[in-house]
Amino acid sequence: MERFLENAMYASRWLLAPVYFGLSLALLALSIKFFQEIIHVLPNIFAIAEADLVLTLLSLIDMALVGGLLVMVMFSGYENFVSQLDISDDKEKLSWLGKMDSTSLKSKVAASIVAISSIHLLRVFMDAKNVPDNKLMWYVIIHLTFVLSAFVMGYLDKLTRDKK
């Protein structure tokens, strides 16, 4: 009975495979939105105000960061929790594949979230005259919470590594 339960639990990791595949569909949706934004801006490039162009560019940067985060979570999560990726040697391979454990993934995700939050905060500040002060305050508080969380996670990981 114990062996059956252990085998069933170990096999259940494959339930995550469709989740990681779903993230690739989310990446496709993000790519469609990215190019939709570019197609929307290009015809108006000579008429658009500089501030509006910068806001659009920040949105594109934000989408690129989210896309990178999706790729990182997809591949690392799959490799850490489901199965090792078997990519032939003749294909281009990401240098970090197979080298990112759950601790380093957590740190990279936290850093990505801080970067994404920074872009959002910059977009909000560029349009600060149209944003109520209390909302600005909450944006800053939330961003600082992300920064503090990433710092604490990194510090705790460093303490854990130093004890080994």
Curated annotation (Swiss-Prot):
Transmembrane segment boundaries? 15-35, 53-73, 136-156
Query: Major place of localization?
Result: membrane
| Membrane topology of this protein | Multi-pass membrane protein
InterPro entries reported in the protein's UniProt record: UPF0114, UPF0114_bac
Where, subcellularly, is it found? Answer: Cell membrane
Any idea which UniProt keywords this protein has?
A: Cell membrane, Membrane, Transmembrane, Transmembrane helix
Pfam families the record matches: UPF0114
NCBIfam families under this entry? HI0507
Instruction: Write out the similarity annotation.
Output: Belongs to the UPF0114 family.
Listed name of the protein: UPF0114 protein Spro_2386
Q: What is the lineage of its organism?
A: Bacteria, Pseudomonadati, Pseudomonadota, Gammaproteobacteria, Enterobacterales
